[in-house]
């Protein structure tokens, strides 16, 4: 279920403040954030934001196609390592 249109998109105020400060200075540096729920705004395009995935910060370079999506969509929390292999024991039981 999406967010109500009358409320508008959400972005962490501290993150937005950091982005605006960097834009004013013209700097490009990695910004660490734990706010996976923040919506990507046009001001963020061109910046690299390190999004926390529960274990480490994953660097995400923001492009124009990402605007409107959430930061958490680009930092997966689960690592799929594949299903179990067939062993001698499992094939012998059949």
Swiss-Prot record:
GO biological process, one term: ribosomal small subunit assembly
One Pfam family it belongs to: Ribosomal_S19
InterPro entries per the UniProt record, alphabetical: Ribosomal_uS19, Ribosomal_uS19_bac-type, Ribosomal_uS19_CS, Ribosomal_uS19_SF
Keyword RNA-binding: yes
CC annotations in GO: cytoplasm; small ribosomal subunit
Organism domain of life: Bacteria
One Gene Ontology term of the molecular function aspect: rRNA binding
Key words, A-Z: Ribonucleoprotein, Ribosomal protein, RNA-binding, rRNA-binding
NCBIfam families associated with the record: rpsS_bact (TIGR01050)
Matches recorded under PANTHER family: RIBOSOMAL PROTEIN S19P FAMILY MEMBER (PTHR11880), SMALL RIBOSOMAL SUBUNIT PROTEIN US19M (PTHR11880:SF8)
Entry similarity comment: Belongs to the universal ribosomal protein uS19 family.
Protein role: Protein S19 forms a complex with S13 that binds strongly to the 16S ribosomal RNA.
Protein name per its UniProtKB record: Small ribosomal subunit protein uS19
Originating organism: Carboxydothermus hydrogenoformans (strain ATCC BAA-161 / DSM 6008 / Z-2901)
Organism placement in taxonomy: Bacteria, Bacillati, Bacillota, Clostridia, Thermoanaerobacterales
UniProt gene name: rpsS
């Amino acid at each position: 279920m999406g967010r109500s249109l009358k409320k508008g998109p959400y972005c962490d105020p501290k993150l937005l403040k950091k982005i605006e400060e960097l834009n004013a200075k013209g700097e490009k540096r990695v910004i660490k954030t734990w706010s996976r729920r923040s919506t990507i705004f046009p001001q963020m395009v061109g910046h690299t934001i390190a999004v926390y995935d529960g274990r480490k910060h994953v660097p995400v370079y923001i492009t124009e196609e990402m605007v409107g999506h959430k930061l958490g969509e680009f930092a997966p929390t689960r690592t799929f390592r594949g299903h179990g292999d067939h062993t001698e024991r499992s094939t012998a039981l059949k």
